[in-house]
């Protein structure tokens, strides 16, 4: 969701030696699946190019005659997915403009409630505005708001990561218990299982009070107003 965002004038994905973007169907721009690695370093480009295609060096037109300087894997994006991506990237500026407009309208509605605080953005001008992350005073209040939003049918698009099975470590029991389909190297297994004993209380305090609202490009002003008012009514009722 960070594609198109910037930090101090530099585009995200271009700040370090390499950057990555996912293009699955929930991202700001999508190919349906797949992603990219971006780099200005020729050595990283060549290694990434081979690593994602079984280790092929791509120096000729005969795949069977390619050399294999290292082991690679099949992480290629298909030509059909790439074609969708090329069409999408032409509209990225349009997507970002809509995202920012809809984000700002909804945030202004939520900001009516003094008990709500918002995620600190290190560079507001560079925010891609794909989500609004907002916070309530306590875990108990937040869970009550989530439950009431669910009861009223307005929870979809609002994510409580703290109770999510995938997006926050609290419920990653498969990782903490090293549940795999193949044997891990003992060193790697030990590092993985360390996660079960780590203290995430500081993160828990933040995440247990956070709800993230996804910003849709399809909303019109009336829909945003209606959505925001319903959310505000639920929050006020719980508070």
Describe the role of every protein-language-model region.
Residues 2-8, 15-131:
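Active-site region of PLP-dependent enzymes
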Residues 39, 134-138, 215-217:
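Short beta-strand-to-loop capping motifs
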Residues 45-46, 118, 143, 156-159:
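Acidic/polar loop patches that form or flank catalytic/metal-binding clefts of enzymes
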Residues 48, 143-152, 228-231:
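Short amphipathic alpha-helices in soluble, non-transmembrane regions
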Residues 56-64, 105-109, 146-211:
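Conserved PLP cofactor-binding pocket of PLP-dependent enzymes
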Residues 139-145, 220-226:
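Short, conserved charged micro-motifs
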Residues 212-222:
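Proline-centric
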Residues 230-238:
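C-terminal alpha-helix
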């Amino acid at each position: 969701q960070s594609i198109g965002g910037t930090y101090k004038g530099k585009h995200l994905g271009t700040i370090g030696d390499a950057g990555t973007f996912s293009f699955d169907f929930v991202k700001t721009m999508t190919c349906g699946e797949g992603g990219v690695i971006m780099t200005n370093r020729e050595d990283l480009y060549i290694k990434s190019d081979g690593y994602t295609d079984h280790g092929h060096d791509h120096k000729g037109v005969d795949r069977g005659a390619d050399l294999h300087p290292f082991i690679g894997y099949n992480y290629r994006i298909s030509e059909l997915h790439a074609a969708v991506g090329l069409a999408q990237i032409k509209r990225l500026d349009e997507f970002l403009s809509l995202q920012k407009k809809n984000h700002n309208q909804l945030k202004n509605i939520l900001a009516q409630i003094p008990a709500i605080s918002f995620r600190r953005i290190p560079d507001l001008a560079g925010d891609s505005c794909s989500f609004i992350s907002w916070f309530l005073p306590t875990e108990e209040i937040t869970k009550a708001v989530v439950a009431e939003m669910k009861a009223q049918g307005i929870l979809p698009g609002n994510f409580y990561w703290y109770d999510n099975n995938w997006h926050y470590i609290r419920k990653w029991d498969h990782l903490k218990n090293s549940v795999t389909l193949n044997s891990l190297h003992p060193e790697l297994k030990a590092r993985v299982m360390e996660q079960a004993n780590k203290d995430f209380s500081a993160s828990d305090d933040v995440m247990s009070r956070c709800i993230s609202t996804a910003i849709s490009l399809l909303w019109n002003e009336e829909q945003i107003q209606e959505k925001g008012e319903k959310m505000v009514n639920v929050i006020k009722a719980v508070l």
